[in-house]
Structures are given as C-alpha cells and as structure tokens.
Amino acid sequence: LLVGNTQSYYASPEDKSYYFIAGDAGSAIAVEYNQENPSLIQLSLKTMGNGKDFLIVPDGGYRNPVSPSSFEMRDFEDGVRRNNLHLHMNGMEVFSFAISNVPKAFKELITYFNIEKANIDYLLLHQANKFFCEKIRKKMGFDIEKTPYNIQEFGNTSGTSVPLLMVTNMHKQLSERKLNILFTGFGVGLSLGVGYMKIENLIIPELLYY
C-alpha cells in the first residue's frame, strides 16, 4: 500500500493558517493475509459530501480545469492570500467536523466489533493539528501516554501521518510486542476513517529523510 502527498506544493506561502504546518511524506506498507487472524483490521469509513468546499483545491480537476484565472491571487480573511490552485481550508468547519464525528465513529466501531477499550494499547490520530488531536483524545478518554504525536517535527503529512507516526514514535514497540491499536484519518470530503488492528513483530525500516 503506497501513500504519498506533497502538501507544501498546494499551500499558499501567504496562507499563515496552513502553510507552516504542511508536510511532505510518503509511506510503503506490505500487507499479508494471515489465515489464523482473518479479522486483523476492522474499519469504518464515512464521507459527508456537504462539507466538500471546506477543504478543497478548487481548480485543476475535470470540474474546474486550470485556466488563467486559476493563478490569480485573491485576498481572504485574516490577511490570507491564495489562488484557486492552492488548498482552501475553512479551519473552524474542519475542526467542528473532526471533533464531532471522529469520537462518534470510534465509539460506533468499538461497539460494533465488541472491542474492549481497556485492551487498547495506543490511539493513533491523523496529525492534522495538535489542538484538534487533543480535543479528540480527551473526548475519547485516552491518556496522553497512549496517544503519541509527531506533528511538531513533520507537520501535517496528510494520508501518511499515521504510518509516519508508527515509524518515528513506536518503532521499538511495534517490532517487539503484540499491540491493539485504534487509528484514524480525516480530511478532504469531508471524510473520515477509523480502524482497529491487532499487530505484532512488524518489520519496520528506519525513516528516510529527503
């Protein structure tokens, strides 16, 4: 499973609300089927399309192809300047979506699959924003020791943020122990995914910087 994103290319240097946390990264995960543990991962995916305009690059696709006007810089609130090839984010709407829907989706997953919350070793959150993540963690009732962060080092790396978190903050634990992990990603759509996995003795290469 290959995932990669160069978010810094989509962030306007004149958008102080996002530019400085946009991170670039890629991940590669080899997934192997195990007959002894066919239910290795449980997932729940949701999309709420009425929030599509809250996190979007307006131009560059089939609906709105690139045109000369795509490059025109425009002024937005709080001194932000960007064009229609830059990421546009309504921070308050994305925040509201995340803190309202991610904990709810986790609780539904835990109930549906009869997961014992006391047996969960780690809660891995998409590293969108430390403030977002802390709100979700507290709503979920998890200790800070079970909820690692690396956004202070790498920023928001989009779909690679959870694999990056595993490599940088949990390398030893994942290599040596059997772990029960809750994880989530959320963003463009607006969409979210939550999951639960049982993993042990992973082979994890060292992080490569570029």
Identify the residue ranges that each predicted region occupies:
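Short, surface-exposed connector motifs at secondary-structure boundaries
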Residues: 114-119
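Acyl-CoA/ACP chain-elongation machinery
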Residues: 3-4, 49-54, 130
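Claisen-condensing/thiolase-fold acyl-transfer catalytic domains that form or cleave C-C bonds
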Residues: 99, 103-106, 121-210
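Short glycine-/acidic-enriched loop or helix-start segments at secondary-structure transitions
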Residues: 10-13, 52, 134-135, 192-193
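Acidic, glycine-rich active-site loops and adjacent beta-strand->loop/helix elements
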Residues: 3-9, 46-48, 153-155, 185-190
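Phosphate-binding/catalytic loop of phosphoryl-transfer enzymes
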Residues: 1-19, 24-29, 189-191
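Condensing-enzyme catalytic core mediating Claisen C-C bond formation in acyl metabolism
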Residues: 15-96, 100, 104, 198-210
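Acidic-glycine-rich active-site phosphate/pyrophosphate-binding loop
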Residues: 1-7, 73-79, 132-142
